């Protein structure tokens, strides 16, 4: 290494002497003033050469320390490249001094050209080394890297030329200074990248990059990662550019308010989805107690309704906020209409949920319950999809400024998709409503058929009602029995209707006795209505006495007298009073009317009205027949319901017990199988253990013999490797000396040519 340092110093001194001789020759050909300036320039160059020599000595010392941990080939090649670079830089400086430096930019350009020449020289050396190794693939890869570095240096040279041209043509204003600064920074980055690639190429050339494929894959992956990062950065820049160009129409407060409202709507939707899921679970696992199950379903539906109403209010608020934004009128109107349509869909969904609440109060069979559960699951999925759409819409609202055409179209498509999801959900609710109404219609039809059968039985039991009609009409003229005959209360216990056609007559079997009905009514309501007939008779007598006191005389049995006094004011007032009382009961159904405690008083009032108004058909007599029938029907319905609930409970108990039996049986069977398998494994392991012990003894004997042979082979191999390493070191030393001699010869030839050219 010391010999190499001495040779390097000698070459540098020789080069300096050549420069001095050429400079003196030029001084002799010039005048005195120019000669002094050239001498000063030569002196400065000589001082620079000495400083460079000292720097080279320091680098050689550091390289010497580093070479103790590296092979000789790497150190030799590194010094060779350093020497060639220094020589080329010296040659460049000599030629530049002969022409004269115009500016600092020309000097930088010359340094880059010197680096370019060194790159070409390194490329030729790399090609020679690779031709020796016959590795075409590695040579192509190295050549490609050299070409890339060359392109980068050419780009740097072009940038310097452009910078020099701009410096000549333009002034030193601030804009030009900034441009020049950016170009210089770009050149510096390219130079650093090229330097790093040269170092990597140098290491690969001198150490032999055998893992070329692995290195190439690693390089490719790094480039792809960088490319992805750049693409992400470009997208971010484009997004930032769009945001800067369009501007933000909403201030921070408005954006925060919209975001909070959208989050609130999202929470409402999630709560509604959870409620629907809970409702589905409740419907699939119907509670044993039907009343408790109905109450639970009612509470869930009411909770869903509240959630939807809250979401509707949030949408209204969002609608108001969005209407105040400074946007285009067309886009604002379109958005307003979409939000209003979503609001209407919410309200329709709320109404449908109320209707569903009414329909789900009754009990349904297993098939109907399964169908409803399936439809509720579909509705839940639709609402979840709508929730996802709202989340996406929230993100877009938070990041967007004024709506341009692309954002408006995207927003419109998302709102339309949410609308379709809600329409599908509402369609599912409507389908549930239709199915439940169909079931109610079927039940109503069944009840109607039962009532028609009862009516036919009444007609068959009293087929001779027409024959009795004349008797009832004649008996009606008698004052003592007027009201009972109007009600159709006969002495035989049967009931009929007076002044009716054959098709409209309704009768009941004789098994429903009027006396029994009256006794039952007196037991329920006390002594005031102990006898319906007596009460009605007393009412008629009181009415007769009142009329006789007012008019003097009145004969109710005479049709002519009744017709002459029917327009009296007292009778009209009484009729109007009774009509007003009866009109108050107009909203009640027949079942509700019969089950009232004052049903007897209502019958008396209705009979009085029909008597005083001379009604052609007595409807109140029909109503009196159905009281016990309706009560028995209600009691039968309660008994049926109790029986169904009891059967359902017993079925569930039996199912649970059978499930427990099946579970214990499966557990016992599984344990038996595991016990048998473990027994087989234990037996096999014992047998295998015996075989393994015998095999281990055999392997131990072979191992001892192999160890003895291995000790002899290790000694022979160590001696062979020592001889091999000695031969390799000797060959590398000889190769380093040969390459150094070649490099020195080439450098001397170049210096000699330059010297001759300067004469």
UniProtKB/Swiss-Prot annotation:
Presence of the UniProt keyword Endoplasmic reticulum in the record: yes
GO biological process, one term: photomorphogenesis
Record-level GO cellular component terms: chloroplast thylakoid membrane; endoplasmic reticulum lumen; nuclear envelope; peroxisome; plant-type vacuole; secretory vesicle
Polar residues bias spans: 63-74
Domain of life per record: Eukaryota
Keyword Repeat on entry: yes
EFE repeat repeat boundaries on the chain: 91-138, 139-176, 177-215, 216-254, 255-293, 294-329, 330-368, 369-407, 408-443, 444-473
Induction comment: Up-regulated by wounding and jasmonic acid treatment.
Modification after translation (UniProt): Binds calcium through the EFE repeats.
Annotated localization: Endoplasmic reticulum lumen; Nucleus envelope; Cytoplasm
Expression sites (tissue/organ): Expressed preferentially in flowers and shoot apex.
Main location: endoplasmic reticulum
GO molecular function, one term: calcium ion binding
Keywords of this entry: Coiled coil, Cytoplasm, Endoplasmic reticulum, Nucleus, Repeat, Signal
Bridged cysteine pairs (disulfide): none
UniProt region (10 X approximate EFE repeat), positions on chain: 91-473
Signal sequence annotation: 1-29
Chain intervals for the UniProt region annotation (Disordered): 55-74, 154-184, 200-219, 271-332, 393-414
Coiled-coil segments: 142-461, 685-734
Domains: entry comment: Contains a N-terminal NAI2 domain (474-759).
Biological role: Involved in seedling development in the dark. May be involved, when interacting with TSK, in the organization of spindle microtubules and may participate, when interacting with GIP1, in structural links between the nuclear envelope and the cytoskeleton.
Record's subunit section: Homomultimer. Interacts (via C-terminal domain) with GIP1, CSN1 (via N-terminal domain) and TSK (via TPR repeats).
Name of the protein this chain belongs to: TSK-associating protein 1
Organism: Arabidopsis thaliana
Biological classification of the source: Eukaryota, Viridiplantae, Streptophyta, Embryophyta, Tracheophyta
Gene: TSA1
């Amino acid at each position: 290494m010391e010999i190499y340092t001495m040779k390097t110093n000698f070459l540098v001194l020789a080069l300096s002497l050549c420069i001095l001789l050429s400079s003196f020759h030029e001084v002799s050909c010039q005048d005195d003033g120019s000669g002094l300036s050239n001498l000063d320039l030569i002196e400065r160059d000589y001082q620079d050469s000495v400083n460079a020599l000292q720097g080279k000595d320091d680098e050689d010392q550091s390289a010497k320390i580093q070479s103790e941990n590296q092979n000789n080939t790497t150190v030799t090649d590194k010094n060779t490249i350093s020497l060639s670079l220094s020589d080329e830089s010296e040659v460049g400086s000599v030629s530049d001094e002969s022409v004269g430096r115009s500016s600092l930019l020309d000097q930088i350009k010359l340094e880059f050209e010197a680096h370019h020449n060194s790159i070409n020289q390194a490329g030729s050396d790399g090609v020679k080394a690779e031709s020796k190794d016959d590795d075409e693939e590695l040579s192509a890869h190295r050549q490609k890297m050299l070409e890339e570095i060359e392109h980068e240096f050419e780009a740097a040279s072009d940038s310097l030329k452009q910078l020099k041209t701009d410096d000549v043509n333009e002034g030193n204003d601030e804009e030009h200074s900034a441009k020049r600064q950016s170009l210089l920074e770009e050149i510096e980055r390219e130079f650093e990248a090229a330097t790093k690639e040269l170092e990597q190429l140098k290491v690969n050339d001198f150490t032999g990059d055998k893992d070329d494929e692995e290195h190439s894959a690693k390089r490719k992956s790094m480039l792809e990662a960088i490319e992805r990062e750049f693409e992400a950065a470009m997208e971010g820049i484009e997004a930032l550019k769009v945001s800067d160009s369009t501007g933000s129409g909403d201030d921070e407060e408005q954006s925060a308010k919209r975001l909070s409202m959208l989050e609130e709507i999202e929470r409402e939707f999630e709560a509604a989805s959870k409620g629907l899921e809970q409702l589905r679970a409740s419907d699939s696992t119907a509670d044993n107690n039907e009343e408790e199950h109905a109450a639970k379903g009612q509470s869930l539906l009411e909770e869903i309704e509240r959630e939807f109403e809250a979401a509707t209010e949030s949408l209204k608020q969002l609608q108001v906020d969005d209407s105040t934004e400074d946007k285009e009128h067309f886009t604002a109107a379109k958005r307003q209409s979409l939000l209003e349509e979503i609001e209407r869909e919410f309200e329709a969904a709320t109404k449908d949920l109320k209707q569903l609440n009414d329909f789900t109060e009754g009990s349904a069979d297993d098939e109907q319950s399964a169908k409803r559960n399936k439809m509720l699951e579909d509705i839940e999925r639709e609402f979840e999809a709508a929730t996802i759409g709202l989340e996406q819409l929230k993100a877009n609202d938070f990041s967007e400024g004024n709506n341009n055409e692309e954002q408006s179209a995207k927003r419109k498509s998302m709102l339309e998709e949410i609308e379709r999801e809600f329409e599908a959900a509402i369609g599912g609710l409507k389908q549930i409503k239709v199915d439940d109404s169909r079931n109610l219609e079927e039940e109503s039809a069944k009840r109607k058929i039962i009532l028609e059968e009862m009516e036919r039985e009444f007609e068959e039991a009293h087929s001779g009602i027409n024959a009795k009609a004349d008797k009832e009409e004649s008996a009606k003229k008698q004052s003592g029995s007027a009201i009972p005959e109007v009600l159709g209360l006969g002495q035989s216990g049967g009931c009929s209707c007076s002044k009716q056609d054959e098709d409209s007559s309704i009768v009941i079997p004789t098994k429903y006795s009027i006396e029994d009905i009256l006794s039952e009514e007196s037991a329920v309501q006390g002594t005031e209505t102990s006898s319906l007939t007596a009460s009605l008779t007393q009412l008629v007598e009181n009415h007769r006495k009142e009329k006789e006191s007012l008019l003097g005389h009145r004969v109710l049995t005479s049709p002519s007298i009744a017709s002459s006094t029917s327009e009296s004011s007292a009778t009209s007032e009484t009729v109007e009073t009774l009509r007003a009382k009866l009109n108050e009961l107009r909203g009640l159904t027949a079942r509700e009317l019969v089950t009232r405690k004052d049903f007897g008083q209502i019958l008396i009032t209705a009979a009085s009205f029909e008597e005083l108004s001379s009604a052609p058909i007595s409807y109140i007599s029909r109503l009196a027949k159905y009281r016990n029938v309706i009560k028995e029907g209600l009691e039968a319905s309660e008994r049926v319901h109790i029986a169904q609930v009891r059967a359902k409970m017993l079925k569930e108990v039996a199912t649970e017990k059978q499930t427990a039996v099946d579970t214990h049986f499966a557990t016992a069977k599984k344990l038996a199988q595991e016990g048998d398998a473990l027994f087989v494994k234990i037996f096999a392991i014992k047998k295998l253990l015996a075989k393994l012990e015998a095999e281990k003894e055999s392997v131990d004997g072979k191992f001892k013999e192999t160890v003895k042979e291995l000790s002899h082979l290790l000694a022979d191999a160590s001696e062979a490797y020592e001889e091999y390493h000695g031969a390799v070191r000797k060959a590398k030393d000889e190769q380093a000396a040969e390459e150094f001699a070649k490099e020195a010869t080439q450098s001397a030839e170049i210096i000699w040519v330059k010297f001759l050219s300067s004469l």
